[in-house]
Amino acid sequence: MNAAGFTFDFRPGRIAVGAGCVDQLGTELERQDIDSAMLVSGRTVGTTPAVVDPIREGLGHRLVAEFPETTPAKTLGTALAGLERARTEGVDAVVAVGGGSTLDTAKVLAALSSHGDSAAAVARDAVETGDLPVATDGDPLSIVAVPTTLAGADLSDLAGVTLSLDRDADLDSERADDGPPSGGVRDPRLMPDALFYDADLYRTTPQSVLASSAMNGFDKGLEMLYSPLSTPITDGTAARGLRLLRSGLGAISEDPMDADRLSDALAGIVAVQYGLAGAEGYRASIVHAFGHGFSHGYDVHQGTIHGIVAPHVLRYVFSEVDGRRDLIAEALGLDVAGRPADVVAEAIVDAVAAVRDELGLPGRLRDVEGVAQGDFPEIADAIHADDLLAVAPDGVDPSVAEIAAILERAW
């Protein structure tokens, strides 16, 4: 460890992992003095009895409203509509059930709630200015998260949002320059006060969704290790999480999924994101910047893009810097003791590609519907402008041309 030491400030809510754990929801809300809650979900999740019925039972009389209207577009308008419903019912908390879009929408809803009667005006201002603050003189609604995917963005106090008041904004047909702009909000008070990772609910998620989200979550563990903001604490959680994920992710392709392996996958996804969104900064990095480059105009999960580009991005990183390759190799269980640095790097690249292949994800950008080589200059510009590129490993600073070359190699 560097003699300068380190700081680590990360304050997640209570975490419950295990089959049937959502039956503790009511008890947890009682412990937190929360009397009433609104269930927030997407339209599919919110109408799937195998998902929502156990949650309804767990919440009991504290469940007073449901808002099954989130979408992948996660617009400001959707969050504002959810807040209006929450106010009508007088709820104390939102229970977000589903994937990253739903969790982000719930956080934006909570951020708006901190502004009281000014929420609609704040939303309109955010569309104009790109700035969505949390009020300093108001408290956001409490958030409880019940993830059903493995993207690993749950233990976080930040959220992305599409800055449009149109709830039905369609981003898939738009390019980044033409569609509504993206924004974000971050505040320690948006960290979920409790999180429930229920294996029974994950069994209801389509295999393709689990697979793509798992690649996204897996890459968070990799990037925590070479982040310039890494600490011995995050090294420990990320490395252990990667081992658990390598043990457990194979369960996703099984029917039925093996209980022990699924348990490993859930424990792993919690571990790899523990400390990801610390007060010191966000510890995801260049691979996620590449994923964000496809976030507008492409109907594709971020994890699918990760699976394709991560091996190529890692090979580039290792060509520029050490990238803590020995630590990453150890975390992945690779026997590379005494091997040359370039051999270690290639073993890591191969291991990450093997995870992708085990998940059944595509290996080339040309195999993703809607992606064209002619889009690469625009995508490369978006990646180069992404905030997460600023927290790439020390010494890694790709030009737009180098980013475009990586995309070409992934084609």
Predicted regions and their residues:
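ATP/NTP phosphate-donor binding region
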Residues: 1-93, 366
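Short glycine/serine/threonine-rich phosphate/pyrophosphate-binding segments
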Residues: 22-25, 48-49, 76, 101-106, ...
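A glycine/threonine-rich phosphate-anchoring loop and its flanking beta-alpha core
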Residues: 5, 114, 118-231, 324-331
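C-terminal charged capping/lid subdomain of soluble metabolic enzymes
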Residues: 335-411
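Active-site segments that bind and position negatively charged phosphate/pyrophosphate groups
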Residues: 227-343
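N-terminal small/polar loop signature for handling phosphorylated ligands or for N-terminal nucleophile
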Residues: 50-125, 129-135, 251-262
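Catalytic nucleophile loop
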Residues: 94-104, 137-153, 288, 302
